A protein has these predicted regions:
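A structural signal for multi-pass alpha-helical bundles of membrane permease subunits
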Residues: 2-9, 13-282
Length: 282
């Protein structure tokens, strides 16, 4: 049922694995390296088909300076933070409560309610595109940061509930029973007993949701348009002119847009790993 650890496989498989892994890593990193290199090249290098060669001149400071001073990139970055941070807070807060209810209390409709939360994650985005857009238009939330935040919270709560519910079910139930014997109210059990134990899971889930929402492009172009509300993933396309694209500026903007999720992961790396591995071994 489970894959065999590489240490237990024949020596020939281990050599194959050790040979193919660096190649796969290089293939995965190659596009990222290309974008990073092109972000410091002059615009003429693209016209001269100098895609992988050494830059004809180093224009890193100029390109990154133009990204911040010659475009609306600062506003797009601000919009991304305005969208991502409230979404993370809202989705994680709701999932903590729904996960507690579905993980602790036993009632007849428990599994069906849990199934409703999880089933939404299997609906293709393309099916929801037109109904969600029409809904935001009728509610007056189209092309607003608030509308995008509310949609992301609603859509991400299903996955977050799955994550939190499974984490809470792995906690020692004796702690909750002991608190009930002492006459502690249910909301105090959640706030003072369960929630402190959920900190690693909250940290791991926050990093995941932050990355998901920050990198979202599909709903950014479906529900928003213009500088006032579009996040950075959609705003990068503003470097496309009518007849040509400024690929050197687009590459620099892509590097800038990728930095916040990377910084978020490294700042929360300890808690992220603890949240994913807690309960994996006894």
């Amino acid at each position: 049922m489970f894959p065999t650890p590489i240490e237990r496989t024949p020596r020939s498989w281990q050599i194959t694995y050790q040979t193919l892994l660096p190649l796969a890593l290089i293939l995965w990193l190659l596009p990222l390296i290309a974008v990073a290199i092109f972000s410091v090249k002059p615009d003429a290098d693209f016209a001269n088909a100098n895609y992988w060669g050494w830059p004809s001149s180093f224009e890193g400071f100029t390109n990154y300076g133009l990204v911040f001073t010659g475009s609306d990139m600062p506003q797009y970055l601000l919009n991304s933070f305005k969208i991502t941070i409230p979404t993370v807070i809202g989705a994680v807060a709701l999932s903590c409560m729904t996960g507690f209810a579905l993980g602790i209390y036993k009632f007849r409709a428990n599994i069906w309610i849990f199934f409703m939360f999880v089933a939404g994650n299997f609906v293709p985005f393309q099916i929801l595109m037109v109904p969600v857009r029409d809904l935001t238009l009728h509610l007056g939330l189209y092309n607003t940061i608030t509308g995008l935040v509310l949609f992301h919270i609603a859509f991400q709560t299903g996955f977050c509930t799955l994550f939190m519910r499974n984490f809470i079910r792995a906690l020692p139930f004796e702690l909750i029973e002991a608190a009930r014997v002492e006459g502690v109210a249910e909301w105090r059990i959640f706030w003072f007993v369960v929630l402190p134990l959920m900190k690693p899971a909250i940290a791991a889930l926050s990093v995941l949701i932050f990355t998901f929402i920050w990198n979202d492009y599909f709903w950014a172009i479906v529900l928003t348009q213009g500088v006032e509300s579009q996040p950075v993933t959609a705003g990068i396309t503003s470097f496309n002119a009518q007849y040509r694209a400024a690929y050197h500026l687009m590459s620099a903007g892509s590097i800038v847009a990728a930095l916040p999720p990377v910084a978020m992961f490294f700042m929360m790396q300890k808690h992220f790993i603890a949240g994913l591995t807690l309960g994996a071994v006894k």
